[in-house]
Amino acid sequence: MSALLRSEARKALATSTVSWLLPLTAVVGVVGTLAPLVASSPGTDPLSDDGLQQAMHGAAAGATLVIVAGIVGTAGEWRFGQSTQTFLTTPRRSHVLLAKGLVHLAIGSIYGIAAGVAATAAAWGWYRSNGHTLPLERSAVWLTLLGCLAVSALFGLLGVAIGAIARSQTTAIVGVLGWHVLIEPTLFTASPTVFRWSPGMASFALRRQPSDDFLTAGPAALVLVAFIAALCAAGLRSVERADVTA
């Protein structure tokens, strides 16, 4: 298994998409952090728990890009005709998918750490320029950052699962972006009570975006993990039944 993990890690790190998505995720995290601070109303207290969470949850604003990296790492093998070689080398397809999942869980964590550091630096600069000190010791800050890191790591695994199910890189990426950016927010707006249980809204809750309509962080984490586990099972079934020459 260790050799398989090293192989999958080398393939992931050699993929240019994974390399340029890392700084892009950090940039989006900085924008997601500064935007609510700059746009906040004059009477808003930036040092309140809600104010801190509103700013710091933006560290995971680019987490959708982590899903894209996971999709590329899995569906890309079919797109570029590498699946035959991969599964001939390691016939146990479940082992291959597990290795990909673990590698992209780690990549998601790296993306999350990079985005968290960049977002914290940006927030620290904004607070300082406005006569405040960013209270890093406050739970509203570090629990939010931990939630952002968890979302980023889990989204790496989610991308692998989606890529395994779809096996079409373009279809999977377009579908994820359409669902996450357009469809899911629209459904949530129409019925918050029902669609707060959806995976995207659970991820917002886990990263502690302030809203009375979201789940609390604990149930949100369970929802997200259960959803990803179900997709991983579906992805494994799809890969095991797939024609690797396709």
Predicted regions and their residues:
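Transmembrane helix boundary and interhelical loop/hinge segments in multi-pass membrane proteins
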Residues: G70-T89, S94
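Transmembrane helix segments
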Residues: G32, R167-F204
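Alpha-helical transmembrane segments and their helix-entry boundary regions
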Residues: V18-L21, S83-T86, V96, T171-I173
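Secretory targeting signals
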Residues: S16-G73, L97-A166, G178, L182, ...
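A short amphipathic helical element positioned immediately N-terminal to and/or at the very start
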Residues: M1-L13
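Generic structural signal for small/hydrophobic residues in well-ordered secondary structure
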Residues: E8, T90-R92, I162, S168, ...
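Helix-capping/transition residues at the boundaries of transmembrane alpha-helices
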Residues: K11, A75, T86-L88, G159, ...
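Short cytosolic juxtamembrane segments of multi-pass membrane proteins
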Residues: R241-A246
